Each structure stands twice: as structure tokens, then as C-alpha cells.
Amino acid sequence: SKSSIETPPSYNQLNYNENLQRFFNSKPVTAPVETDPIKMEQSYSTPANTGSNLSPMQCFEDSGGSGSSRNCTSGSNLNMGSVTNTSNTGTGTSSGSAPLVTLTESLLK
């Protein structure tokens, strides 16, 4: 016996499969997939004083076994360049790490 507090399914929830079928039957026009790799624009300034602003890779390489730790504490300014995705078809993934997959009816089943 179900609780009377539960919300009954809505019309859209009951007809989810029918809505999907109707969507794919309508042959929707989708944006063409770009064959160019995602254009990446690096936007960061190179610090003049590299003694206190080290890249995360430099901190990682210097931290192992040598006994001398450069200014790599969590409070130091790490030079982490921010990468901006300038492509309007990007999915937020980095360039080439995940292939773009076109949504098809078979993927939803």
C-alpha cells in the first residue's frame, strides 16, 4: 500500500516514451557538428616575479625528495592559466578528451 502523501506522476511523466518517439519521428534539425578542433584561447598573464608565483607543475616537481620546498604552500599564488572555450558548439570538455556524440534514439533505450 502506497502512502497518500506521494505526488502522482504528471501527464508528461506518464507519456515520456511517447514524447521521445514523437520527437525522433519529427526528424528534428540539429546543429552541424564542427570538424575543427575546439578553439582554445589562453587568457592569463605571465608574472614577472617567478620566485613566488610558481605553476602547479613546478611545485609538484620540486616537492619530491629534494628537501628544499619552494613557496608551494596552499596559500601561495599559483599561476594557473584559465582556458576559455571560444567555440559555440563546445560541450565544456577540454580539447580532444571526449568525442562529441550525437544524441540518437538508440542511445536513450
From Swiss-Prot:
Compartments reported by the entry: Nucleus; Cytoplasm, Perinuclear region
Residue ranges, compositional bias (Low complexity):
81-97
Q: Which GO terms describe its cellular component?
A: nucleus; perinuclear region of cytoplasm
Secretion signal span: none
Q: Which residues cross the membrane?
A: none
Q: Where is this region: Disordered?
A: 42-109
Metal-binding recorded as keyword = no
PTM info? Phosphorylated with a circadian rhythmicity, probably by the double-time protein (dbt). Phosphorylation could be implicated in the stability of per monomer and in the formation of heterodimer per-tim.
Query: What are the GO BP annotations of this UniProt entry?
Result: rhythmic process
Its primary localisation, in coarse terms, equals nucleus
Repeat: is it a keyword of this entry? yes
Q: Which UniProt keywords apply?
A: Biological rhythms, Cytoplasm, Nucleus, Phosphoprotein, Repeat
The record's note on quaternary structure and interaction partners says:
Forms a heterodimer with timeless (TIM); the complex then translocates into the nucleus.
What is its biological role? Essential for biological clock functions. Determines the period length of circadian and ultradian rhythms; an increase in PER dosage leads to shortened circadian rhythms and a decrease leads to lengthened circadian rhythms. Essential for the circadian rhythmicity of locomotor activity, eclosion behavior, and for the rhythmic component of the male courtship song that originates in the thoracic nervous system. The biological cycle depends on the rhythmic formation and nuclear localization of the TIM-PER complex. Light induces the degradation of TIM, which promotes elimination of PER.
Q: What name appears for this protein in its UniProt entry? A: Period circadian protein
